[in-house]
């Protein structure tokens, strides 16, 4: 079968691949567009597998609250530029919808889920081949509760807040506060004993180095430890929208309590590859001479 311009155009529209790639694929498939797509998809998957080894530390956080379920996903890319790509954003939107509908809590289940008749893992491979970067759903969580709030700041920090009592506005305000203040625990009493002991050791050392007597240093540190546990816990912090009141006071006034919260930040815990620009240029120049 002849490879026509119309066939090349159709293949480009269906695969988003380059014109030359589409023409070559059609020639190899003797004009059979379905076979060409199959071959290109196989090729795309091979490229995706190769790119999967790259570090994906940029990306976006997505949240959704519906039907008593709050869901949050971190979807990673290699660069911030791709994180703003329409195809990347559309893929993320589909992921959050399927994760919310099925209350998904692990990446394996998410990758095995189906969107638009295609497995998420296959859709991801196709997108990687199209965009040319490693793309990876990194983590997902779905929680149920009576009063759920979600907040995303700049696409990079996302929070789910689980409350008992209060209203929707309060739940969202608490999620917003967690995004901004980054508390490590819900209440001061939740701070583990080993964390308190370590901080006390540090503060005692600081006090003793300042020349304070041991008994005075101990009293000073006791006051500092109360401040420390308040600063690292949600309810002990000053409310971000009204610093004159604490989060604990706000919750009491609203007859509410925070059961828990979950905070995602894009790329946290991922060690980004440090690029040596001079070495990269030298390598490119050496390759060009070959």
UniProtKB/Swiss-Prot annotation:
One matching Pfam family: EF_TS
Keywords noted in UniProt: Cytoplasm, Elongation factor, Protein biosynthesis
Region (Involved in Mg(2+) ion dislocation from EF-Tu): 79-82
Compartments, record wording: Cytoplasm
Transmembrane segments: none
GO MF term set: translation elongation factor activity
Coarse class of the protein's main subcellular location: cytoplasm
Coiled coil: none
Function: Associates with the EF-Tu.GDP complex and induces the exchange of GDP to GTP. It remains bound to the aminoacyl-tRNA.EF-Tu.GTP complex up to the GTP hydrolysis stage on the ribosome.
Family to which this protein belongs: Belongs to the EF-Ts family.
Protein name (record): Elongation factor Ts
